[in-house]
């Protein structure tokens, strides 16, 4: 007689959203498969689902399941193989005066002021530009799954950029970044990813999960600059050109 072992935790429930206009490709329809992070196993669940293409927002893990479309391709950087190109090395030289550190994720007014300035300059027509300090705190605090904040500060101690990151069992997931919009020469969005890659290299963590690469979307296409880049396709993770067919 076989014995079914007891469940160590409740089964994870998944749901599918209704159709919405795609925020990345004009004329497309977006639907998502999603689940909530609740309980004490958030870090483990986040790690497992990140490996199969899910992303986190607040206490929700989601991935696109859009009808007739597979444009959103999950991508990650294999840290040991990554080598910055000439443009990225120039960005690193420009930012030599910045220091970077990973700290426990805790919302502050200093962060919110920078976040609000970034939204106003870069995304002034988005819902995020209407976020209050309480909304920002919820973004940082809800669904914590071993979540940290990568800070970039100049020599005077001023916060120039920040990235909300989740520590996974095989690396880091870059959740959201924001930075000083009055410093375009620094290319701080790219620099924050480079700094996270270096933190992972020092810690021996193999991957940086960057979310979705979307060909034809200016907001998402930039991720292909980080080479080599792996993408999740039908047969698992593979170099982007092979997996994004």
Predicted regions and their residues:
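Conserved acetyl-CoA-binding loop-helix of GNAT-fold acetyltransferases
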Residues: 185-197
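Terminal substrate-recognition subdomain of acyl/acetyltransferases
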Residues: 1-104, 201-202, 206-245
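Short, flexible segments with low predicted structural confidence
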Residues: 16-21, 172, 194-195
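Residue-level preference for non-acidic, small/hydrophobic
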Residues: 49, 115, 193-196, 223
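A conserved beta-strand-loop-helix scaffold within acyl/acetyltransferase catalytic domains
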Residues: 57-67, 77-185, 225
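Active-site catalytic microenvironments for nucleophilic, acid-base chemistry
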Residues: 121, 195, 199-203
